[in-house]
Amino acid sequence: MTLIAFGINHKTAPVELREKVAFSPDAMVEALKSLAHLTGADESVIVSTCNRTEIYAQAENLTADALTTWLAEFHQAKADELGLNSYIYHQEDAIKHIMRVACGLDSLILGEPQILGQVKQAFVSAKDSGVIKSDFERLFQQTFSVAKRVRSETEIGSNAVSVAYASVQLAKHIFSSLKKSNVLLIGAGETIELVAKHMHEQGVKKLSVANRTLARAEAIAQPLGATTLTLTQIPAHLKDADIVISSTASQLPILGKGLVERALKDRRHKPMFLVDLAVPRDIEAEVGELDDAYLYTVDDLQQIVEKNIESRQHAALQAQQMIEEQAQQYMLWRQGQSSIDVLRDFRQQSESQRDTLIAKALNQLADGKEAEQVIKELANKLTNSLIHAPTKALKKAAMQQDNKNMSLLQDALGLARANDSSK
C-alpha cells in the first residue's frame, strides 16, 4: 500500500488557486466517494481550509498524477497549474507531514490551534463517508495524540504572534482578569476586528467600538454584543474605559494628552491601559507621560511578537522530535500489521488445502474405500501440499547460493543448519 499526502498551501499556491480547489463541507462526502471511485483510494481524508487543500490517501500504485487529475476535474481547474503549485509526500514522509499540519507546524502562523480542529473535522467527515479503515484510524488517532502532547508539553501556542493578540495578552497580564474591565476600541479595520474577537473571548465587562463610519463599527460590534460610538462621542465616554486600543488610518491623533488627562481626572486617577496600533499614531506620545496612563505602541508590541516567534520556533523543534517518535511508532505498527496479514493469508491457505483434502477423503470413505488406505493417502497429500511452497523456496535459495534466504527458511521451518553442531 502506498500512503500519500498531496496538496497545495499558502506557501506554494496563490489565493486564487487555493479558492478554486477548496471544498465546502457540503461537498466533502461527494468528493471522498468520487476520490475512492476514480483513483482507487482505499482510505482517504481531505483537509480544506483557507490556507490549504490536502488529500491524504492510501492505495495500491497511487500516483501524484492521478490525484492532480482528479482534483482538477472535480473543481474544473487546470491540471498543469495544480501540478506546478502542488507538493507530494510518500510513506513515512507523508505521515510526518500529516502530523506537522495537525500540530500547527506547517501553518501560516506557527503553532496556531485552529488547524487541529479542522483536521479532526476532516477525519470525522471521512469516517461518515465510509472511507476510513484500520490504517487511517490508527494514523489519525496517533496524530491527534501527538498534537495534544505538543500543546501540553511545549510553548508552541502560549505566546502571542500577532499585534492584535499581543495587545490583549498584555492587557490581561496587567489586569490579571479582564472580566471587570471596560474596553474601548477605536477603528474598524481588520486589526480592531481581531482585537474585538479576542476581547469578547476573554469575557470583558463591556466592549465598545468607536469609528468614523458607524456602519462599519456596527458590523464588528453587533455579533459580539458590543456597543458603538462615533469618534465625536469618545470624549464623553473615555472616562469609562479601563482599556483603550486604537488602530485607524487617521493622519492626525485621535486621543491627545489633554483629553486623556481629563478622563483620568474624572476616573479619580484609576489607571488606564492604552495601546496604539496605528501608523501614524492615533494617541499622542505625550500621553505616556501621565502618571496613571500606561501607553504602548505598535513597536513595543512588535518586539513582544518577535520574541514570542523565537519562542515558538524553539518549541517547534521540540514538537518535531515528538512527531519523529510518533511517526516511527506508527511505521512499526504498520509493518507489524503487514506480517499479521501475511500470517493470516498463510493460515487461510493452509486451512483451505486441509479442508479440500478432508472433503475428498470423506467422499472416498462414503464410497466404501478402506479407511487405512484413505488415511495414509490423506496424510501423504496433506504433507506434500504443505511442503510444496517451502521446498520450492529452499531449492531456489540453494541454486542461487542465497545463504541469507536459506538461513531464514531454515529458521522458519525449524531445520538445523548444515554447519550447526549436532545435538
UniProtKB/Swiss-Prot annotation:
EC numbers on record: 1.2.1.70
Which residues of this UniProt protein bind substrate? Answer: T49, C50, N51, R52, S107, E112, P113, Q114, Q118
Query: Where is the site Important for activity?
Result: H97
GO biological process terms held by the UniProt record: protoporphyrinogen IX biosynthetic process from glutamate
The record's active-site residues are C50
| Pfam assignment, any one | GlutR_N
Q: Does the keyword Oxidoreductase apply?
A: yes
Which InterPro entries does the record associate with it?
4pyrrol_synth_GluRdtase, 4pyrrol_synth_GluRdtase_dimer, 4pyrrol_synth_GluRdtase_N, GluRdtase_CS, GluRdtase_dimer_dom_sf, GluRdtase_N_sf, NAD(P)-bd_dom_sf, Shikm_DH/Glu-tRNA_Rdtase
Pathway annotation from the record: Porphyrin-containing compound metabolism; protoporphyrin-IX biosynthesis; 5-aminolevulinate from L-glutamyl-tRNA(Glu): step 1/2
GO molecular function terms here? glutamyl-tRNA reductase activity; NADP binding
Q: Where does NADP(+) bind?
A: G187, A188, G189, E190, T191, I192
- Catalysed reaction equations from the record: (S)-4-amino-5-oxopentanoate + tRNA(Glu) + NADP(+) = L-glutamyl-tRNA(Glu) + NADPH + H(+)
Keyword annotations of the record: NADP, Oxidoreductase, Porphyrin biosynthesis
Additional record remark:
During catalysis, the active site Cys acts as a nucleophile attacking the alpha-carbonyl group of tRNA-bound glutamate with the formation of a thioester intermediate between enzyme and glutamate, and the concomitant release of tRNA(Glu). The thioester intermediate is finally reduced by direct hydride transfer from NADPH, to form the product GSA.
How this chain assembles, per its entry, is: Homodimer.
What is this protein for, i.e. what is its function? Answer: Catalyzes the NADPH-dependent reduction of glutamyl-tRNA(Glu) to glutamate 1-semialdehyde (GSA).
Recorded domain comment: Possesses an unusual extended V-shaped dimeric structure with each monomer consisting of three distinct domains arranged along a curved 'spinal' alpha-helix. The N-terminal catalytic domain specifically recognizes the glutamate moiety of the substrate. The second domain is the NADPH-binding domain, and the third C-terminal domain is responsible for dimerization.
Would you identify the family this protein belongs to, as annotated? Belongs to the glutamyl-tRNA reductase family.
What is this protein identified as? Glutamyl-tRNA reductase
